[in-house]
Structures are given as C-alpha cells and as structure tokens.
Amino acid sequence: MTVKVDKNYEQLLDRLYDRLPDKAQKSGQQNLPNLIVLQVGNTTIIRNFSEYCDRIRREDKLCMRYLLKELAAPGSLGENGQLVIQGKFSSQVVTMLMERFLKMYVQCSTCRSFDTILKRDKKVWIISCLACGAQTPVKQF
C-alpha cells in the first residue's frame, strides 16, 4: 500500500513542477540603478527614468503617473528617457516614492521577488510573479 502512495505522491509532484513557470532571471532590488535626480531651476529631472522602469518591468507612463500623482505636480517624459517634473523635489523624496511604488506594485507579496509583471484584468490590477507563480490583486492609483 505504501508503494502506491509513494508513486501517487511522485506523480503529484511531477504534475506540480510541470505547472510551475520556468524560473526567471533574478532581478532583485540590489540590481536596480540609483535614480539620478537633478534640480534645474524650478524643475526636477530624473535622468535614468526609462532605464529604471525597464529594469522593474513597468511602463514609463505608469510609473510617471504614479510619481506625478504622489508629488501632486505636472510633468512629462522627455527625450532620452528622462522624466521632467515641474517643481523642486529632493532626491530623497523621489527615491522614497519609488521605493513605495516597488513595494506596492512590483514586489511579490508571497516570495518577495521583484520578477513580476503587472497586468490588468477588467478593472483589477494583478501582480503576477514570474518566480513563484503567485497572483496578487493590488489597488489602483
């Protein structure tokens, strides 16, 4: 009887491993570049904004919308992948807001991996983890 249980257990394990997604390349937070924040007059420029968004697998416009909404300031995506914000903001404030964005809309709540994709299913935003396969709904912004 124990032989059947062992075979059954192994079959279930094989089935589980077949359904799990392939392990994605790790792109942890330590691999993220530091944001280069410059203040020119009354504007704040984030020079490597597009590169940063590419690393976290989020669209530039989505990250820009979050950041501008949190700062309550107008801004636009400039050429060469930089974000131009109307107003003076310190690099600490911008970095803190992007870290909050990472925790809320990038990091998997199950395994804490940053290998995720944000997708929209009807009116619900869902974080799909590429490392563990978990899907977590998040609130809109």
Swiss-Prot record:
One of its GO terms (molecular function) is translation initiation factor activity. The keyword Protein biosynthesis applies. It comes from the Archaea. Keywords: Initiation factor, Protein biosynthesis. The keyword Iron-sulfur does not apply. Pfam families: eIF-5_eIF-2B. Belongs to the eIF-2-beta/eIF-5 family. eIF-2 functions in the early steps of protein synthesis by forming a ternary complex with GTP and initiator tRNA. Heterotrimer composed of an alpha, a beta and a gamma chain. This is Translation initiation factor 2 subunit beta. It comes from Sulfolobus acidocaldarius (strain ATCC 33909 / DSM 639 / JCM 8929 / NBRC 15157 / NCIMB 11770).
